[in-house]
């Protein structure tokens, strides 16, 4: 018994009983739970490039300032990128996170150790996690050599990067509401989330947004890519390509097919990709100018979230 505002003793057991019943109702009623939650509060950014770790580019600039802007607007964020060999670890104060490292990822019947590093952008109060591996990310370039030729193993590098992000997020025990993918290196994330990780508690309610940039690669992925990317939960029937080289257009369409929303991140977009996007039946955000894109993207997260919970 406790005194109420008038000093009268009341039986509080009934109050606590009501609270427990209400919480159990929320837990078991998905629709009510989502109304109660109202909006997506946690956003995971998977980025092909981020400045200042790499030179400025359309993707690198967006992925530097968008997470900061979204965080300043009240959402919780995590950000990942590959640890390319041309990133200066000492200057940028990267250090390995031992508790997150050590897993082996098998790609094409070969074990590849997963190494996780982290650094902070102090001005943004933002941490960036890096996916590293000696086989894939030690060369002193990003996705092309000094002559502008795409690396032959870019297909495996993209598989390793995306799977590395998924496994690390699981170890962090952090459940994202939205995953926002930037660049073709991240294009497998929608497929993996919707198929290979569909029943995982970290990702089963996650909605995926793919930002389509005009950053085509010049050498198609080999025909063996469709076999290398397979995981439990993914069938060859899920792919729009099998047993043939995969170009930028096909890879982008695969990402769009398994996404919950698409953003046109570059001012121009390949006509076939634009048409495919508009016919996909999911929310689509046209190109936004540099002055407005952070607010527009931030609002789009809730559009995608609410559309998926109608």
Feature map (PLM): residue ranges:
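Catalytic cores of nucleotide-sugar-dependent glycosyltransferases that transfer UDP/GDP/TDP-activated
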Residues: 25, 36-310
